[in-house]
C-alpha cells in the first residue's frame, strides 16, 4: 500500500519481533535452527529505524524443551509439512528452536537497540504455541502486552522482524483486534513462506485494516 509520509508521534511504538539467533541465517558462530531466508539483511535497517522511536518493545520466542510446536515432540512427524490437532486448533510443526537458555534463543547480538523498554517472552508454556505478541494461539490467554501499551498511552504500533507470515503477522492482527492502529514495515521483515502463507496473511491484513508500508513512508 502506498501511503503519504507519516510523522512519528509520542504515542507510537516499534515492535521488533523475534530477532533471535535461531531465526537468522547461519553464521560461523551459530547455525539457525529455523532460519528465515534474508533475515539477517533487515538487521541494519531495524537498528536505524529503532533509533527514531522513543518506545521500542522486543519480543523473544522462549520455548521449553519438548514444546508442542516441535516436530521432534511428535514421533514420526516432520517439520514444515506436518501438523497436529490441538485443543486450540491445528498446529504447524517446526524444527526445535529458541529453546529456553540456549544460544539459539538469544536475541542476535547485531540487534543494537539499547533503549528498548521491554523484552517480552512468549511461547513458554509447553502445551500451547504463541505466534502473537499479544495472545497465545488459543486467542484467549493474554501475554500482558496490550495492558503494558495502554498504560503508556501507546496507540499506534509499527511491526518489523521475523517472520512476516507468522509471528509478525499474527501480532499485528491481534493488535488490531485489540484496538491498536497497526502498521507492518514490509521492507524490515521476511517470510517463512510456506505454501499460501504470505497470501493468507496479506488477505487477513486487508480484512483487519492492518496497513503495509515501508521505511520510506515514515
Regions found by a protein language model. Name each.
Residues 69, 130-133, 170, 195-196:
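Short, well-ordered secondary-structure micro-motifs
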Residues 64, 126, 165-166:
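Glycine-rich nucleotide phosphate-binding loop and flanking beta-alpha elements
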Residues 96-101, 134-138, 161:
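Short, surface-exposed loop/turn motifs that are enriched in glycine and acidic residues
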Residues 1-123, 151, 155, 177-181, ...:
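Active-site acidic carboxylates
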Residues 154-170, 184-189:
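Glycine-rich anion-binding loop/nest that anchors nucleotide
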Residues 168-178:
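Short Gly/Thr/Asp-enriched flexible loops that form oxyanion-binding sites at enzyme active sites
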Residues 113-152:
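Histidine/lysine/aspartate-rich catalytic loop segments that bind and position anionic ligands
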Amino acid at each position: 500500500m502506498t501511503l503519504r509520509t507519516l510523522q512519528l508521534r509520542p504515542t507510537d511504538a516499534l515492535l521488533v519481533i523475534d530477532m533471535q539467533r535461531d531465526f537468522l541465517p547461519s553464521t560461523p558462530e551459530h547455525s539457525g535452527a529455523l532460519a528465515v531466508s534474508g533475515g539477517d539483511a533487515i538487521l541494519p535497517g531495524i537498528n536505524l529505524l529503532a533509533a527514531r522511536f522513543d518506545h521500542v518493545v522486543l519480543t523473544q520466542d522462549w520455548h521449553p524443551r519438548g514444546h508442542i510446536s516441535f516436530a521432534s515432540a511428535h514421533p514420526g512427524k516432520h517439520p514444515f509439512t506436518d501438523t497436529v490437532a490441538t485443543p486450540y486448533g491445528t498446529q504447524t510443526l517446526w524444527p526445535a528452536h529458541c529453546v529456553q537458555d540456549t544460544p539459539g534463543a538469544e536475541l542476535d547480538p547485531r540487534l543494537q537497540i539499547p533503549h528498548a523498554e521491554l523484552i517480552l517472552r512468549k511461547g513458554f508454556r509447553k502445551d500451547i504455541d504463541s505466534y502473537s505478541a499479544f495472545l497465545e494461539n488459543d486467542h484467549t490467554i493474554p501475554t500482558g502486552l496490550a495492558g503494558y501499551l495502554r498504560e503508556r498511552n501507546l496507540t499506534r504500533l509499527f511491526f518489523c522482524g521475523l517472520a512476516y507470515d507468522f509471528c509478525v503477522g499474527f501480532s499485528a492482527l491481534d493488535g488490531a483486534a485489540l484496538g491498536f492502529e497497526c502498521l507492518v514495515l514490509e521492507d524490515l521483515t521476511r517470510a517463512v513462506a510456506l505454501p499460501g502463507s504470505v497470501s493468507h496473511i496479506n488477505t487477513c491484513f486487508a480484512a483487519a485494516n492492518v496497513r503495509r508500508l515501508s521505511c520510506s513512508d515514515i
